Design a protein with these regions (language model features):
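Positively charged n-region of N-terminal signal peptides that target proteins for export
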Residues: 1-4
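Bacterial N-terminal signal peptides
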Residues: 7-17
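Short beta-strand edge/turn micro-motifs at domain boundaries
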Residues: 22, 140-169
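Short, low-complexity N-terminal intrinsically disordered segments enriched in polar/charged residues
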Residues: 22-65, 174-176
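Surface-exposed, charged secondary-structure patches
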Residues: 23, 71-72, 84-134
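Hydrophobic pocket/interface hotspot
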Residues: 47, 62, 70, 123, ...
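N-terminal, post-signal-peptide region of Sec/Tat-exported proteins
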Residues: 55-82
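A mature extracytoplasmic/lumenal domain signature
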Residues: 66, 76, 125-127, 160-161
Length: 176
């Protein structure tokens, strides 16, 4: 009897994980492929693609483009009428956007100015937000992006942004 129980225990340890792995849903089916970000232009395009779409879409690519401790910080109007940064972690931003469900938005950088030194860069970009990929812009604003190159790719350390609805019209020098 002891031999049978021991054999059953060994079989459970060896075969159950294998069977479970064979029947588990494939992570590849739900994981979004993230394009390379070896240049600032690739990073900008990948960021637009990663934040755009339905609120509840897979954000694996966004997580890969941002450093683990990255901050996403919109400038918001406070109840007393002043303006203040509202710093979010990557998870905070994903949870907030997921509340939109299937409702989508599409962000597009229309002008990007990048300053690089060594392994870091600052991107000053004018963005437009649309309700559909080719629809009219409903919001415009400015992003300030801090990016770091690890020797193989660019990743985002922080994004600070403010829409024109709080800051006023976009100055001509930031328009395409």
């Amino acid at each position: 009897m002891r031999r049978f129980v021991l054999s059953l225990a060994v079989a459970s340890i060896v075969f159950v994980p294998v069977l479970h792995a064979q029947h588990a849903p494939s992570a590849q089916k739900t994981t979004q492929t993230c394009p390379p970000s070896t240049t600032i232009q690739e990073l900008t395009k990948a960021l637009d693609d990663a934040v755009s779409g339905p609120g509840n879409k897979d954000r694996t690519c966004l997580r890969n483009l941002l450093l683990p401790d990255a901050r996403l910080t919109p400038i918001r109007k406070t109840p007393d009428g002043s303006f203040a940064p509202h710093a979010l972690t990557v998870d905070d931003w994903i949870k907030a956007v997921a509340q939109r469900g299937e409702t989508a938005f599409y962000e597009r950088q229309i002008k990007v100015t990048a300053e690089n030194y060594g392994h870091f860069a600052h991107l000053w970009s004018t963005y437009e937000i649309r309700d559909t990929p080719d629809g009219p812009a409903t919001v415009t604003g400015i992003n300030s992006v801090q990016a770091v190159n690890d020797g193989t790719r660019w990743r985002v350390l922080s994004i600070l942004w403010e829409p024109d609805t709080t800051a006023g019209p976009i100055p001509e020098r930031y328009k395409p």
